[in-house]
């Protein structure tokens, strides 16, 4: 019989200052503190004045059981000097300890009455400054109420969460639209911290041009390695280890810049530009981070420090209660900057924020997944073994494609060169969403239907976990649509493949649908198995027609932004829909049992019931690549995922993407205050995390969320106009991907176009450029092998359409410039800013040459360099190599350019 595990003590500690006054402190040369504990624990006791923790020597004491102890915290020489001056002295005691497995802190402050003997008889009392502040707004950055952001000032203690905190947003303090409607949403306050990929926002007085930015030598997206330069003026500190964290910074260039999306100037001027600071890889769950800006200058002159921050930094007491309450919170901030070796007097501003816990970020969709698969009878999702039943499947239609009459031209309607059959139907999926109501959708019929467009997660009363039961009683389901296609036995051969095929889950792009799965039948080497896809609800075409049009109305100031919650909520339901589709493909009683998927009485595809991952893979493009990263972290039935043109951190991708150009003018018109707009976009990430990889990136490869381990191939299109390269690289860093090298041909990273600043990037000098910092590179020869990746679980390959090629009308037909290093999307030739070339987003994922690298990996044959020459993958001009299945690859003609441009 196994020995019982010892109970973990959950002792609670309190502290009390016993020293009566200043005279007693100076006489004893120590601060007397009483420490009480309700059980066994170890306590580190320290004291500070005005956030200065170097005035007293800390002590650590141990409790073996419940009791109280008195400790003396000796004054240091600087403490005797500072606290020996005339005047009452306010001190704060902090006790740090373990409560169970969680870190806990007890704090207590006291003002020690002054020693009159230290004050001259005629010395007038010192009048304390009393700066003006706004209730519930952080006084250290008064430009806007919720600056700086993210910020633990906007949290409250909550012992029920893993971080010990809960967000405490208030409607009256949050950004508002043109009609004065707050973007407040109660969903924010379900979080126990901020996003691992939050855009960090603050305002630096006078810093509003690229010249003033470069004057300070800030780390930027093109030279991330500068984050740990000894003199770096913007730093992010992980307080767990006092180490700097990789970041990059920029100015919000939207205010005062000609609007590339139409409509002239965006509201605001250069003076409204905030500083935006971005993590270069996902931050760690549940950790506390300190942001610090120091030694800032504009035009060679020091930037003025906000008076409240200066009072806190320099230990100057005020008569303002809100400032003094903030002082207690700032003590840990200054302790972190002290430990990081940053002189306190150099600070322009500093603050702290806590990242949400893994449990908080993942438990909603995890509870949905566990419940959904429990209903099928599979209670162990980590073993790759099928247990229980297949989902309920309905086949609605089948269609046999015609062959193409000419192999060198595009197919006509109802024809496909590579696909033989299309099958459409639905899968019954547990629905964990409510009925949207008319305020969330333009579809009257869908307003009363759970899981319809505009619906949000359905929470049981008093619970933070979604439930399938409407009104607490009736479980509801959703018929998730799917499209599957089965390949031919060869190009234009009028016969269906008969047996032994692999299975592929396909993830479509933004505002598309399950029908996009058919496109796999258009490209050479793309359809190498039975492929099935469902809708990425939340950002599918059904949402565009209903919920997203309603969202546009909201942005147009008819309501507040609480409707946004539906987008990431619906995406999480979409993960469950996709996992059920995968189980329908993997299970022998699923699709394989239907005649439409059989030939001669035998299924045309074969998935091992004891190791599903070797026969089933995931392939997603664009939104499918983004959502595919998150779903792979949750996926029990596939091992390998190919993520084409993916990224993470939607709040950073948003304004950089041409896909959102149709929405942004409406956003700009509804939210006219540039600073509030920047804060609002950053806030969205707190909700959006669960609807993209930010919440799940730490577990994509390692099976940390109760799945088998996974392998991932990331495909980046250099200069992508829809998914900025910087966010694809952020995903690669976050999961530890190795890049296939050489990454780019010489000169490509310097091909900047009209946004070049005297030959440099806007925020970075060309001789400092290193965009792929901290992504290991392995040369091509290390990859050409079967059986998996070369010692890695993740690889990133960068493909390039090459320099811009212009057509007879002068418009670009192929090739692109590098991404500009600002937060505005590349634009087309008829916009107010000259074009940046032809968007490589679609060709980058669908070129025959690229398919030759994506598909063999997906099917378990490892990662291969289809170009075969060890050179960077510039594939813009023909000839393209033929698929690897050919014993002697030879060049083949490219599809007609209009074929790709029209999205076929």
Where are the regions a protein language model picked out?
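C-terminal subdomain of alpha/beta-hydrolase-fold enzymes, centered on the catalytic histidine
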Residues: 502, 562, 566, 570-573, ...
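Polybasic, low-complexity, intrinsically disordered segments
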Residues: 1-142, 148, 160-163
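Cap/lid segment of the alpha/beta-hydrolase catalytic domain
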Residues: 437-438, 442-479, 495-600
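A conserved hydrophobic secondary-structure block that centers on an alpha-helix together
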Residues: 269-294, 298-299, 470, 475-521
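Short proline/glycine- and polar residue-rich coil/turn motifs
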Residues: 60-69, 265-270, 472-476
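Domain-level recognition of soluble alpha/beta enzyme cores
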Residues: 386-496, 503
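Acidic, low-complexity Ser/Thr/Gly/Pro-rich repeat segments typical of extracellular/periplasmic
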Residues: 121-410, 415-439
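Primarily recognizes the serine-hydrolase "nucleophile elbow" in alpha/beta-hydrolase
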Residues: 597-655
